[in-house]
Regions:
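Soluble, non-transmembrane catalytic domains of enzymes that act on hydrophobic metabolites at membranes
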Residues: 49-52, 58-72, 153-154, 160, ...
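Hydrophobic residues at beta-strand termini and immediately following loops
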Residues: 6, 25, 149-150, 166
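A cross-family glycoside hydrolase active-site/sugar-binding cleft signature
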Residues: 26, 80, 229
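Active-site HxH/HxHxD metal-binding segment of metal-dependent hydrolases
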Residues: 41-146
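Conserved beta-strand hairpin/beta-sheet module of binuclear metal-dependent hydrolase folds
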Residues: 1-43, 175-187, 192
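A conserved mid-domain beta-alpha-beta active-site/ligand-binding segment of alpha/beta enzyme cores
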Residues: 148, 156
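Metallo-beta-lactamase
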Residues: 29-31, 135-140, 160-238
Length: 243
């Protein structure tokens, strides 16, 4: 099993090679062409090698490019159980919208946010890449099989990967845990700070109590390597103990 990091315009995408197939996690809006180009040019795989495309939550920088990429590859698309279900998310976490607005407002004034979302050079570098497979008639006609991911489920075709429901950043947030290697893909539940040299909590969240519980849940898994939705990858023993 090999996990490849693809740094896209807005977030980290992960392309996982396992048992001769590809699993793709978190494709941002307008970055599907960039990810598909990486699969074809860098990994030398056919688009048909992609069997499953998943997202960790329904923010546009994690779900936005998943559907067009899955269509181009004739793959299955899988999203968390509560994604794209605002009524369910509000019922489960009624304080969520107000907390998310408050934390987003605070983060919006930080220079790193402006650099991420308002950087024209980053736009030119990533968004101009378009793969012809995205426009093929067969991709447009393809009826996309969709799955909903619930806590403790195993990914279709990739049974070594377990879904872990981790509300906090958003109620629909999930992580993906690979049991044989203790590898953990966290989306926005945990981020990797290169400057601090460790994993950190996200600055934007919708429920701090749920966040603490989710981190404790992940700590019990004892991950050896953590692949965050933004920032650097970290490996080692007890890498969540400081959180």
């Amino acid at each position: 099993m090999n996990i490849h990091l693809v740094k896209t315009r807005y977030s980290n995408t992960y392309v996982i090679e396992e048992h001769g197939k590809l699993l793709v996690a978190d494709v941002a809006m307008r970055c599907d062409g960039f990810v598909l180009d990486f699969i074809v040019r860098e990994l030398k795989h056919k688009v048909s090698s992609v069997a499953l495309v998943v997202c960790t939550h329904d923010d546009p920088d994690h779900i936005g490019g998943g559907t067009p990429l899955a269509r181009a590859c004739h793959a299955i698309a899988a999203i968390p159980h509560a994604s794209k279900r605002p009524t369910l998310k509000f019922y489960r976490n009624p304080i969520g919208p107000m907390v998310k607005i408050a934390t987003t407002f605070g983060e919006a004034f930080r220079s790193r946010s402006r650099n991420m979302y308002m950087n024209k050079e980053r736009n030119r570098r990533y968004e101009h890449i378009h793969n012809h497979h995205l426009d093929e008639p067969a991709a447009q006609r393809f009826v996309l099989p969709k799955l909903r991911l619930i806590d403790k489920a195993r990914l279709d075709g990739f049974p070594n990967w377990e879904v872990v429901h981790t509300p906090g950043h958003s109620w629909d947030s999930i992580c993906l845990f690979h049991h044989p290697t203790a590898s953990l893909i966290t989306g926005d539940t945990l981020l990797g700070s290169g400057s601090k040299g460790r994993l950190v909590h996200p600055a934007i969240y919708d429920n701090p109590v749920a966040m603490r519980r989710s981190v404790e849940k992940l700590r019990r898994l004892k991950p050896r390597t953590v692949y965050p939705g933004h920032g650097s990858i970290f490996s080692g023993d007890d890498i969540l103990n400081h959180l």
